[in-house]
Design a protein with these regions (language model features):
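Small-residue-rich helix-loop
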Residues: 112-167, 171
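Membrane-interface interhelical loops and short interface/amphipathic helices
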Residues: 32-82
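Short helix-perturbing small/polar motifs within transmembrane alpha-helices
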Residues: 1-36
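Selected alpha-helical membrane-embedding segments in polytopic membrane proteins
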Residues: 63, 69-117
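Long, positively charged, glycine-interspersed low-complexity recognition regions
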Residues: 150-225
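Membrane-interfacial segments
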Residues: 6, 10, 39, 105-116, ...
Length: 225
């Protein structure tokens, strides 16, 4: 409903995305509260349940005690990190869901003859410059303050880094997609190249760096590219 209202009242794409994501997070938080998920996370009950299931699986496996202990420690570390990153995961999920819904709804309305504002295709995606640069500056300041003053705000910094780096990587991916569509005619080859870039850790960081560069220089408009 909020997407339909914003499109029909000619709200900007950034405003509509922000409102849609906010409502998504509010709705998700309400569902988690009503189902007791938030309480289970805060009390540690959810981790206990995961650990119990993991323990049963390891006991049924033909592993030595040393291997079971090593896998249990790895699982515990991974789950603790996953719990710390839940806010970033929820925010990114909300942005993806809202973007896809917004894009599909807007395109269908345009096909139906309505003049509405909606996001352009993915290969032309560009994050709003001011919020991105402010976020990068705040994260840099927080990292410096935490390093020199030991503020113990690592979970907040980590969530912020995951969100900002992921968004910049998406922008970098859209730039790569732009040039693949321009120079690589085969859809299969384009998909293969994109898959290779995504599965290589260096490629992911390269996408984020490309997205950050695009905040200062419009990479798609470089002469001769």
């Amino acid at each position: 409903l909020i997407l339909d209202y914003c499109m029909r009242t000619d709200r900007s794409v950034d405003t509509t995305m922000a409102l849609g994501t906010l409502l998504f997070l509010v709705g998700l938080g309400f569902i988690m509260y009503r189902t007791g998920t938030i309480q289970a996370i805060e009390s540690g009950e959810l981790m206990k349940n995961f650990s119990a299931v993991q323990g049963e699986i390891l006991q049924r496996a033909s592993l030595t005690e040393a291997e079971q202990a090593r896998l249990a420690m790895t699982f515990k570390t991974t789950m603790n990190r996953a719990m710390d990153l839940l806010p970033a995961f929820f925010l990114l999920s909300g942005l993806v869901v809202v973007y896809l819904s917004y894009r599909i709804s807007g395109r269908n309305m345009r096909i139906g003859g309505e003049k509405v504002i909606c996001p352009g295709p993915f290969f032309l995606m560009h994050l709003p410059r001011v919020p991105v640069l402010i976020s990068v500056g705040l994260l840099g300041t927080a990292l410096a303050m935490n390093y020199f003053m030991a503020l113990s705000i690592e979970p907040y910094i980590l969530n912020g880094l995951v969100v900002v780096v992921s968004l910049l990587a998406c922008q970098g991916m859209s730039i790569v997609n732009f040039y693949l569509l321009r120079f690589v005619p085969s859809p299969f080859l384009r998909g293969l190249i994109m898959f290779f870039v995504l599965v290589v850790p260096v490629g992911q960081m390269g996408l984020a760096a490309l997205g950050l560069i695009d905040q200062f220089i419009d990479v798609r408009s470089i002469e001769g590219a």
